[in-house]
Regions:
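Conserved ABC ATPase "signature" region
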Residues: 102-128
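Conserved ABC ATPase signature
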Residues: 132-136, 140
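Hydrophobic anchor residue at the start of the ABC signature
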Residues: 146
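Catalytic Walker B motif of ABC-type/P-loop ATPase nucleotide-binding domains
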Residues: 157-160
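H-loop/switch region of ABC-family ATPase nucleotide-binding domains
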Residues: 189-190
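A short, surface-exposed alpha-helical micro-motif characterized by mixed small hydrophobic
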Residues: 195-197
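Conserved beta-strand-loop-alpha-helix hinge in the C-terminal portion
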Residues: 209-221
Length: 221
């Protein structure tokens, strides 16, 4: 009986973990002696000035378990000549055969439409579904990038300023949508109020180190 109790009290292994590690970008040390763990189910905001290491840390997190991560980069990275539909669908390419993907590129297939259309509707992109993404606004392009991540249906979402190009109200709604669809979320955010509202844990980066790591509720007290 006591053995089972002891086993149940052991915390789960961290999803991500760094122990006294150095993270570099283009040969330059960005974060030094980094010790950090993130558990499954956490919603973490990375805050800090430009160049503090948020993007570098997200890249390192992604490299730890790439097959489990839906990734939303700071620059949407869309294919401009393709439609919103096709750019969202790109997140699901690995789930289908090459032949299926080629046919769907020429003419959207019903099965693919049934998956993409609800995502586009949630993102407010249903009217732009068959517009080429070079015709979209910056905010619409960013929402398309989020859609490409959502369609992957992975447990972890990593986002580098994923709502920087939309207004505060839209950003809040998009971040809620992201959190509803992923068990674990790590976001680089510049809006501290937004970070406190959406995330359960805040990590602050400055001068190559973690200078803040606290529950959101503690910082709002």
């Amino acid at each position: 009986m006591s053995q089972n109790t002891n086993q149940s009290s052991v915390p789960p292994a961290p999803l991500f973990q760094f122990s006294d590690q150095r993270l570099q970008y283009q040969g330059r040390t960005v974060l030094d002696k980094l010790s950090l763990s993130i558990a499954s189910g956490e919603r973490v905001a990375l805050i800090g000035e430009s160049g503090a290491g948020k993007s570098t840390l997200l890249k390192a997190l992604r490299e730890q378990c790439p097959d489990q991560v839906a990734w939303c980069p700071q620059q949407p990275g869309l294919v401009p000549i393709l439609s919103t539909f096709h750019n969202i669908y790109m997140g699901a390419l690995d789930s289908h055969s090459l032949a299926y993907n080629l046919i769907n590129l020429i003419k959207p297939l019903p099965g693919a439409l049934n998956i993409v259309q609800p995502i586009a509707k949630q993102l407010g992109l249903e009217q732009q579904l068959f517009s080429s993404t070079d015709k979209l606004s910056g905010g619409q392009q960013q929402r398309t990038s989020i859609g490409r991540a959502l369609i992957q249906q992975r447990g972890i979402f990593l986002g580098d300023e994923p709502v920087a190009n939309v207004d505060e109200y839209q950003g809040e709604a998009l971040l809620q949508l992201i959190c509803q669809n992923h068990e674990t979320v790590v976001l680089a955010l510049h809006d501290i109020a937004q970070a406190l509202s959406i995330c359960t844990r805040i990590i602050g980066l400055q001068d190559g180190a973690i200078v803040l790591d606290a529950p959101s509720e503690q910082l709002q007290a």
